[in-house]
UniProtKB/Swiss-Prot annotation:
Its EC number is 3.1.2.-, 3.1.2.22. Belongs to the AB hydrolase superfamily. AB hydrolase 2 family. It is found in: Cytoplasm; Nucleus. This is Acyl-protein thioesterase 1. Coiled coil: none annotated. It comes from the Eukaryota. Pfam families: Abhydrolase_2. It comes from Candida albicans (strain SC5314 / ATCC MYA-2876) (Yeast). Signal peptide: none annotated. Keywords: Cytoplasm, Fatty acid metabolism, Hydrolase, Lipid metabolism, Nucleus, Serine esterase.
Length: 231
């Protein structure tokens, strides 16, 4: 499966790092294309960065009465970790993200340790899982309002073939009043990945924030990116 993407190349000179960020259900890459401008306005990061915002394919989504919408995998029941899950679609999207990582490394000569993957909601779920399954070490992972709908499958795959990113920095952020992906579901997801052995995962709580990214959370994300890009 190949997908299109919004690409915002580094300004002025060759990129030294890359951020690949996956949107949530029903959104598009364009929905997060403002992120580079926010990073620039912060004046915290000087190194040039390639930004890639992939577009999920339009697929029939069960909670949308079967009508097609942009989605990284089908959802049968919103926010329920025990519901039926689209395991096949989920792992297909993980493979797509792997392809974008390799593209940045092979085509643009970005060091793997300077590549950060991430996403919001569905995109966060894919990013966390992909990090667990990679056989190459990368720079970091950002998971905003994320979850893990394939808990058993991730555990089984990881135990059979542990990845190499067990000490890779992971930023997970979640609002306490998220009505879509419950805060506790996000917290359980962080505990799952910690149990798998990801010792450099930090779960960040944002009081009063719903299913969105607050200014405080985004400021923390920029600092996280800076620490990886400029180390």
């Amino acid at each position: 499966m190949s997908v299109s993407a919004i690409r915002i190349p580094a300004n002025g000179s060759s990129a030294k790092a890359a951020v690949i960020f996956l949107h949530g259900l029903g959104d598009s890459g364009d929905g997060w294309s403002w992120l580079p401008q926010l990073v620039s306005q912060s004046k915290l990061i000087n190194d040039p960065i390639n930004y890639v915002f992939p577009n999920a394919p339009k697929i029939p989504v069960t909670i949308n009465n079967g009508f097609a919408m942009p989605a990284w995998f089908d959802i049968y029941e919103l926010g329920n970790p025990h519901a039926k899950q689209d395991v096949t679609g989920f792992f297909k999207s993980c493979e797509v993200l792997k392809e974008f990582i390799l593209e940045q490394h092979n085509k643009f000569n970005i060091p793997l340790e300077k590549i950060i993957i991430g996403g919001f909601s569905q995109g966060a779920a894919i990013s966390l899982a992909t990090l667990a399954l990679l056989d190459t070490k990368i720079g970091g992972c950002v998971a905003l309002s994320g979850f893990c709908p394939v808990r058993n499958e991730i555990t089984d795959r990881y135990n059979k073939n542990p990845g190499v990113n067990f000490d890779t920095p992971i930023f997970q952020g979640h609002g306490t009043v998220d009505p879509v992906i419950n805060y506790d579901y996000g917290k359980q997801t962080s505990e799952l990945y910690k149990q798998l052995g990801f010792k450099n995962l930090k779960f960040n709580t944002y009081e009063g924030v719903a299913h969105s990214a607050s200014e405080e959370e985004l400021a923390d994300v920029i600092k996280f990116i800076k620490n990886i890009v400029e180390k």
